[in-house]
């Protein structure tokens, strides 16, 4: 595809600039009617939703929902936008995004840079896309972690009518103390409060929107056991496994390999897939799983499915392989 020709030029730019330029080029191509990648339908029913195919876009590429229609032209079975926070925030200081091409890896410490939930809602309302849209929600960096539930409630209420499902992101390593919400009373309070509000909104709008949790790969067996118990207790609708890792296995001696932030791409594949397998074993098909982390070829998508995933998501693999990866993954999954 054309991406193989454009990639050397994009990789000559700073990663964040290349990210912005790629999205801009996609939007232009879409407006010109040049984005029509045909993907063979492979319907999957998950969380009460019928997905046209099981391969989705992970959150982080389109944080503000400004490129939904263009991304839809690539043939994803579903698109997840965000992470969004109640108020706009600029994120962490630049540089904060690093390519490690030798390992097909990326390190980011973006810090939930976004234009705020109100702008995202306006962008979603303006989009023509009528497919499956996930909206990923988080907390503002300056909100104390003990008040985090308030930020999640604000976002939940504002995006509820515009999302096919809503992802609660408590696993980014780039917002101080965010991962502490994955354990103990903090997780219990968060899930209990959000589930209660979800059910109230479902009754108010006569429309049920599934609630999904996104977790990190850096979890112990005890963590996995506890999180699983909480998911079942509060009847959370799905689990995304996993976010980026703090591990540097596979990139230790490479340029930028020791930059702070979350590592994604090929090196996280084994770790995230093992985490997925562990959750699948504990949950025993009681909650659907979405596998993400290190998918750079079709066989990786199959491995996620074999480990227990009903759906998969890709992001970093797209940067190295291009949109052909979507079709490859859909074709590989039987």
UniProtKB/Swiss-Prot annotation:
Cofactor annotation: FMN
Function: Catalyzes the conversion of dihydroorotate to orotate with quinone as electron acceptor.
Protein name, per record: Dihydroorotate dehydrogenase (quinone)
Localization per record: Cell membrane
Reactions catalysed: (S)-dihydroorotate + a quinone = orotate + a quinol
PANTHER family: DIHYDROOROTATE DEHYDROGENASE (QUINONE), MITOCHONDRIAL (PTHR48109:SF4), DIHYDROOROTATE DEHYDROGENASE (QUINONE), MITOCHONDRIAL-RELATED (PTHR48109)
Cellular compartments per GO CC: cytoplasm; plasma membrane
Residue numbers annotated as active site: 172
Similarity comment text for this entry: Belongs to the dihydroorotate dehydrogenase family. Type 2 subfamily.
Membrane topology designation: Peripheral membrane protein
Note on how the cofactor is bound: Binds 1 FMN per subunit.
UniProt pathway annotation: Pyrimidine metabolism; UMP biosynthesis via de novo pathway; orotate from (S)-dihydroorotate (quinone route): step 1/1
Originating species: Acinetobacter baylyi (strain ATCC 33305 / BD413 / ADP1)
Residues that coordinate or bind substrate: 63, 108-112, 169, 174, 243-244
Keyword line: Cell membrane, Flavoprotein, FMN, Membrane, Oxidoreductase, Pyrimidine biosynthesis
Protein's UniProt keywords contain Flavoprotein: yes
Gene behind the chain: pyrD
Annotated positions binding FMN: 59-63, 83, 136, 169, 214, 242, 265, 294, 315-316
InterPro entries referenced in this protein's UniProt entry, alphabetically: Aldolase_TIM, DHO_dehydrogenase, Dihydroorotate_DH_1_2, Dihydroorotate_DH_2, Dihydroorotate_DH_cat, Dihydroorotate_DH_CS
Coiled coil start-end: none
EC number: 1.3.5.2
Complexes and interactors: Monomer.
GO molecular function: dihydroorotate dehydrogenase (quinone) activity
One GO biological process term: 'de novo' UMP biosynthetic process
Pfam families for this protein: DHO_dh (PF01180)
SUPFAM superfamilies: FMN-linked oxidoreductases
